[in-house]
Amino acid sequence: LGPIQKAVFDEYCSEALDALTDDIDAIYLCHHGAMVAEHLDDPDGYIAKEIRKKIGPKVPILMTLDLHANISDTMCSSVDLICGYRTNPHVDQFERGQEAAFSLRQILSGQANPKVAHVKLPLAPSSITLLTATGPLGEVIDYGQRRQAELGGKIMNVSIFGNFICSDVPENGISIVVTARNDFDIAKNLAEEL
């Protein structure tokens, strides 16, 4: 355990970026979201940013992340949608992948032009307090899902990330990420409400 060695991270990024071609319709990143490297506090954000630089603004990038991800502004500004697990213990990875695929279909068909809003809270609770069947995190996740339903098709995704306390990085802390279908203000308002 510990930070990823720079040489290993650089090799991974080089292989991933070299594999991207001009005929790609979309990118799906399935990461944990709390990666740390010897030379980077936010490797997940770095990867998303470098992919965005290589493929340009028109190719959608979607990301599914563990509920314990440490979310950065770089991640949120580099991708079109972030979809986080809603359960701890994690039992909904498959459903979040389906949700990301459904969202991608909407984006590719022109039914959505996603806008991502991110609010970081100055809290970094320990993992034991992040159970979702009971307790405050589960209640907030449930409330976010109810608000998404109330707003109808205006919101594509509401994800609340508890953080990964063992990663001693500036990105650590609770994050609320809301993706609106096409209106940043709606996403930002809901993220701030939550």
Model-predicted segments: where are they?
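Active-site histidine-anchored catalytic micro-motif
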Residues: 3-13, 17, 21-109
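Short, structured patches in soluble enzyme cores that scaffold and shape functional sites
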Residues: 65, 86-87, 120-125, 180
